[in-house]
């Protein structure tokens, strides 16, 4: 089983316009869809579609549209009640394909809520072959959160594999952490930032250089760098 954590889930709404977006105007949409979102949620949805057992850990009320949509699609989840609705992210699509994205802030985590999320992930990890910590972090969770959760999982006795799929400060903190994840997947720019490489564009154009650069992270204790 693959366990995913989406600390900052969202309800992703896409609105299609029949004319270009006009600031300050009232416009009618020609189409609209909404889906549960967040990296971990999307991973669990893809795994479920591929008939791979998965459980998605999601902060939010069981009656929230994100979680009812997961339930309706058959994705198993373990939710942490927060007393707040899950945020909505809105993408507006112009007729020529130009997109405008509006991302709302997520739930502000208190220390008590953070501890409860840690406990839920650890409890759900008992039967997991992989634990995937994915996506951005909401307010109240520091950049070191994923690194600290990796350490807590190992301290709890979890012996499976841990993947971290994030970016910017949380990724840097994860790589710098004492307890390393099993797998990370930085892009070329992030790989350069993590290793001190001078030109990420050179990595983008050279698979051989990328492999050599990624090897430095493998040598530092991360078995798989994709």
Predicted regions and their residues:
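Structural motif
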Residues: 1-3, 100, 129-130, 183, ...
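General beta-strand structural signal in soluble alpha/beta enzymes
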Residues: 5, 58, 78-79, 133, ...
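Conserved N-terminal subdomain of the carbohydrate kinase-like
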Residues: 25, 48-129
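Short beta-strands and strand-loop turn motifs
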Residues: 101-103, 128-136, 185-188
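Short, small-residue-enriched loops and turns at beta-alpha junctions
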Residues: 107-110, 137-141, 170-172, 192-193
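Hydrophobic alpha-helical segments and helix pairs
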Residues: 110-153, 159-160
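Conserved phosphate/ATP/ADP-binding segment of small-molecule kinases
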Residues: 148-226
């Amino acid at each position: 089983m693959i366990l995913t954590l989406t600390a900052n889930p969202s309800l992703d709404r896409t609105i299609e316009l029949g004319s270009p977006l006009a600031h300050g105007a009232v416009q009618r949409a020609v189409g609209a869809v909404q889906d549960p979102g967040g990296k971990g949620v999307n991973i669990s949805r893809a795994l479920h579609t591929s008939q791979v057992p998965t459980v998605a850990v999601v902060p939010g009320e069981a009656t929230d549209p994100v979680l009812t949509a997961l339930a309706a699609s058959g994705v198993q989840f373990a939710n942490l009640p927060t007393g707040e609705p899950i945020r909505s992210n809105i993408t507006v699509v112009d007729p020529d394909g130009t997109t405008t994205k509006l991302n709302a802030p997520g739930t502000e985590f208190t220390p008590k809520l953070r501890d409860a999320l840690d406990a839920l992930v650890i409890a759900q990890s008992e039967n997991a072959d992989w634990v995937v910590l994915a996506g951005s972090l909401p307010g109240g969770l520091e950049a070191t959160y994923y690194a600290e959760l990796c350490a807590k999982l190992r301290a709890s006795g979890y012996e499976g594999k841990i993947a971290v799929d994030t970016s910017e400060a949380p990724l840097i903190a994860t790589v710098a952490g004492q307890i390393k994840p099993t797998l990370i997947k930085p892009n070329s720019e992030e790989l350069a930032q993590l290793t001190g490489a001078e030109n990420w564009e050179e990595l983008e154009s050279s698979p051989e250089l990328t492999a050599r650069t990624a090897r430095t992270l493998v040598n530092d204790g991360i078995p798989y760098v994709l």
